[in-house]
Each structure stands twice: as C-alpha cells, then as structure tokens.
C-alpha cells in the first residue's frame, strides 16, 4: 500500500511572483549566478529561486547547466524543463512540465 501524498502546498506560500502554476506544470522565476565554484540550488533569494552554476555564461553553457540542475532537483527528465525567458540574463523563467503538486512539494522543502 502506497503512502498518501502530502497535501499540495499553496503557491501563495512562496515569494510573490516566483511560482506560477497551471494544469501542465509550473513556471519558476530563477536567479542564476554563473561561474560559481560549484553548481547547486541555493533556495529562495528575494522573489526568485536562486541557483549557482559552475559553467560560464558563454555559448549557452550556463543555460544548459541551469536546465540540467533544475531537472535533477525536481527529479524530472531534462526534456520536461525549458528556458522560456532570460536566455542572456541572470533573471530567467523556467517551465517544468510535470504534476504541479509534486513540484510544489519539492519546492516546499526549501522554505
């Protein structure tokens, strides 16, 4: 017998404007810090999900690493994660196509 899923967190529990939920998944506002000593999820910084990326912001390397890191954090394949805005800046919008309740539970662990 499977254990029941925890209740879906309210998207309003996260920083304002950081998480947008719809039927297909979530869109996450991300603040990326390239050329860090290692790639890692930091958590919430102001109104964004902060990640540190070891890759330099050259030829899309940091963007590719950002997508891979977020896919690994949420436990979804990379093909379900896409960069929808911010290809050339630190502020990004990342779309994750997966059941929103599971994604929000993962995000709640950072709060």
UniProtKB/Swiss-Prot annotation:
InterPro entries on file: DUF167, YggU-like_sf
Any one GO cellular component localisation term in the record: cytoplasm
A Pfam family per the record: DUF167
Top-rank taxon: Bacteria
Annotated TM spans: none
Family recorded in the similarity comment: Belongs to the UPF0235 family.
HAMAP family, A to Z: UPF0235
Protein name, UniProt field: UPF0235 protein glr3835
Record organism: Gloeobacter violaceus (strain ATCC 29082 / PCC 7421)
Lineage of the organism: Bacteria, Bacillati, Cyanobacteriota, Cyanophyceae, Gloeobacterales
């Amino acid at each position: 017998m499977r254990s029941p899923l925890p209740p879906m967190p309210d998207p309003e529990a996260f920083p304002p404007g950081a998480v947008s939920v719809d039927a297909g998944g979530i869109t996450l506002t991300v603040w990326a810090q390239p050329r860090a000593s290692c790639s890692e999820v930091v958590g919430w910084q102001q109104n964004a999900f902060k990640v540190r990326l070891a890759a330099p912001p050259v030829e899309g390397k940091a963007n590719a690493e950002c997508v891979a890191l977020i896919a690994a954090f949420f436990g979804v394949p990379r093909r379900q994660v896409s960069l929808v805005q911010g290809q050339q800046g630190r502020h990004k919008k990342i779309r994750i196509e997966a059941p929103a309740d599971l994604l929000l539970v993962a995000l709640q662990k950072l709060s």
